[in-house]
Amino acid sequence: AGIFLAGYMDRIGLVPLIGLQLVMLATSGWLLRNSLGYLPESSMGRRGSTWVDMMSGLKLVWHHRRLFQLMMVVAATGFLGFGLYLVAMPLLTREVYQQGASFFASIQFTFMLGMIIANVIIIRLVGRFRQPGRVLLTSLLIRGLFLIIMALHPPVWLLFLLVLLWGGASGVAMMLGRSLTHEESPQKYRARVVSVYQLSLFGAATVGAWLSGHAIASVGVLTAIGTLGATIAQ
């Protein structure tokens, strides 16, 4: 609903939409605060250093071969996939297809729809994968191929189909990445390892978005998408 509402930015205006979002966020925070119970300070116990907890999770991943390799794949997913998506899709909408906010909102919705469909399917099939790591790598390859086709400036209907499939492949990667992270991490350190997973995915996405912006500024949107797609496929 939020994506569709943002699609009306050209008609409503940016300031009213941001104001509405602030009201909704404040309302959600107030409702969440009222729905949570209160714990006495004495029952919370003594908490250790957050920095020490973070470093212990990083050290565990560093010395665990399978977890380290998994985090490298997750980081590649964020760096080459989501980073490019964050920067390239708005520019592709405006500069290549000469469209506005409603078109971009439709792309966002299509991508998220692909992720939701993939998650529903993976929930049913995740226990049947004998080699989930190979499926994870295959999803990375498939996304690279989708980007290469997208760089050829396809018609609008094919673009949306590619975005849907791209979102589906991204959903597969995220779902399997989380599942493998939970399976491989020791019970005692699971929360810390999951935090490393989040850091690998979204931290690498931030760097990937920055580099994607420089690549697009240097060679153009379509060329940058094709180049990064070929890099992912390799």
What are these regions, as identified by a protein language model?
Residues V23-E41:
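C-terminal membrane-cytosol helix-exit motif in multi-pass small-molecule transporters
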Residues A1, V73, V196-S200:
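Hydrophobic alpha-helical segments of secondary membrane carriers
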Residues A6, V15-M24, M55, W62, ...:
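C-terminal transmembrane bundle of multi-pass solute transporters/carriers
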Residues G2, M24-S28, L84, A118:
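Membrane-embedded alpha-helical core segments of multi-pass
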